[in-house]
């Protein structure tokens, strides 16, 4: 029973997740409605009275230009906006109707099931299984001309009665349709007179999908109940696949297909709609002597117009995938190549190009690659194209490890999607989340050809999820070991998503080079072992860690890096009202001298001895550096000296360790808690460290080149 008072929970459920949109002709916005307590009683009154207020019937339409000649009216897309209050009521009614009425399972559009996957797999399985069995098969893809705009209101009333919708709800729905008007904006400040809407469902109205599906439900039930027609999938006869107004007719018998097509055309004609024969297409393959022979001459008609036939060289598009005589066509990387060239040529900064590829180009590619015919080679080609483009945009070496690209940002990578490992796993997850009560899905998943597809996907996906695989790769590679600690704190990775204030594009690229091991040094695998020594004359391997942390050539810059971070921490502590001493000299009676970076005296709390250190975040964990630094002062000799310097004080020994590659380790959590370090402060100190690392490397390169030039 859908005609009942509205509960407060229904209002809350309808408002939850309601995205802001333009106001209707009454000027009310979604934000205004979600903030007021009026809607429940107000919309309930009009629902129970079966009355549609005049402001709800008045809508406004804006024309959005499409591609092509704008003098042609068909190249404009009308967007009609109704009252937000009415949309709220219709969201509630739509949920009630969906819960009360069970439509035919062949309709996957607007249903709570992964309909695009199921229908695509059903079509591919039908074609491939019939070809394997060398049997006749026919597929007709039908285009309904402006289906949502032309469905008659009388057919909607008929559908509501057929489905047993109660009289109160039916009267309200028919009233909201028959009394509707709209005005079309035709220029700045100008609009047409009111235009009465005599057919079609409202675009953007929450009820429209259910009403259209309700009309189509009669056709789907009629076809399913007709004996003998349909295509065989597993043990089931399936005559039609529907996704909203996208219809596919499946038929094993050539003789019955024209009759089925005529029945469908007549159904739409009686309900104010029509089939577009020129945009429809058919596949027809006859089996003769154990050989499948495609028909190349059109033989099906709609309104005396022949439907085009797909031959061996052609495909047709269905739900974003291309299908031909052999089933789903293998996806290509042509569009990806074109998109990446556009991104690379765009006048954007490096971090903007990276963000565009990661957040827009790759996600746009994901759906098209979730194709039954996808292969490992196609996915590898797509991955290689993306990696190559990112390397050029960020000026990375060809030998940059793949884990630097595919590990999650929280694991120390750039967060790109590894298509080779992700796409098969995504498809398997979608398949495993299917609704087992759907008889069409059950028929699909029991088909032998589907078992072959599933086995192939399992082999492609592997045993380890991509995120785990690449995190392990980061943790076990010489160049990237230690970056997995970026997951310890958001401050270690925030700059990858959003360039810090004051950074140039060059600063961002240099920071990426540091993370990925791309700062130029002599100690790289391609150099002979004898040519990897430091050009500063210290006789050590010229690794990035050596240059930044140990080489005496840039010792002054290292000291300035340390002092800047220590000063910033001291300034923060002073802003809290604490007394701060920087590098105090604390001498023990036996002559030992201690010079901690900062001592913070907090009123009513133990004083904090904080020594700052920038350590290389590599094979030696930063936790070990933290413990070593703590042991420097956490012993009896220092406590005796500190007690003489500050009588009556107690002390906490809490170092602050920063990773040279911008890592804030978990071991700093006690220090951060005691000294009230915010995420913003931690991030700013790490950003300073990263910029200083770039300066250190530049100074080193200048120094060694000057030395070589002088020699």
Swiss-Prot record:
EC number(s) recorded for this UniProt protein: 2.7.7.49
PROSITE patterns in UniProt: RT_POL
Keyword Chaperone listed: no
Source species, domain of life: Eukaryota
Name of the molecule in the record: Retrovirus-related Pol polyprotein from type-1 retrotransposable element R2
Catalytic reaction annotation: DNA(n) + a 2'-deoxyribonucleoside 5'-triphosphate = DNA(n+1) + diphosphate
Keywords: Endonuclease, Hydrolase, Nuclease, Nucleotidyltransferase, RNA-directed DNA polymerase, Transferase, Transposable element
Origin species: Popillia japonica
Occurrences of domain Reverse transcriptase (ranges): 45-323
Gene Ontology molecular-function annotations: endonuclease activity; RNA-directed DNA polymerase activity
Positions of the UniProt region annotated as Nucleic acid-binding endonuclease: 444-711
